[in-house]
């Protein structure tokens, strides 16, 4: 039974991806089964885990229901990854049109829920449907933030 953890903050550059990849790798080193679902179109968790961000299918195909979740998973020595790239930016259109659109990721992750000890969702730096999906799917949320005054301002 998995623990699904979304790593989120609407601000970019605060360390969400670094936290996600480091937690995943540390838990893998402890013998845990881990998966990163990269929901950021920048695909930095994907490349940070050593996966080509243009390998498909990935998060976009999963959300658009063009691929099965098992076909989207890439195995690495550091943990498993569902890759992302700039194509994921188009997922919002697929989500807007989807029935129960805020549950698309939750429903997809149910299929692999018992295969992993931890599933990390690396969220984009925004509050839109991808992030909403991640938050609905998650059991817990880690909000990464700097502690200086300007860190709490958003553009």
Give the residues covered by each predicted segment.
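P-loop NTP-binding core
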Residues: 1-150, 155
